[in-house]
Amino acid sequence: MKSAFEIPFAGLKVGTHEYEFDVNDSFFSSLPYSLVEKGIVKVWLDLEKKETMMIAHFECFGHMEQICSRCNEIVLVEVDAELDVIYKFGSLEEETNDDNLIMVSYDTCELDVSHQLYEMISLATPARPLHEEGECNEEMVELIAKYQVKETNKKDDDVDPRWSALKGLN
């Protein structure tokens, strides 16, 4: 079955071509081990085809549902990102150290950009999503404060005697 994120580039003329993709819940659920479950993201792709390579410029904007790290409730996180990828025609055995350079074999006629879309969207989300100050579930915030372990004010003078002997070595 052909994916909505596959681009048949074999018949494309040399030049720039524009594409639009709608990334939604079904996209995220179709990917194994996806960290994102729900979201709506609009993606624009400018694909410049040349004789020996294709240069892709992705832009995305939208929002995703994630779990707030403070109160464990759902928070809407905005996604706004760009990604540039170079698809170079050549042997797949060629090694590259550049994450934005992808080798494409000469006999390939379609380009599946779903991995690049997921990577761009995932990297645009915060590692620790939080509600704005004052928007968290108050009941949960109170419970966290109630059970939070208080830090003891341990002075530097309370050093283990074995370690204090090392201070005299200077």
Segment roles from a protein language model:
Residues 75:
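Cys/His-rich microdomains that often coordinate metals
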Residues 78-81:
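Short Cys/His-rich "knuckle" micro-motifs
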Residues 1-67:
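A positional/architectural concept
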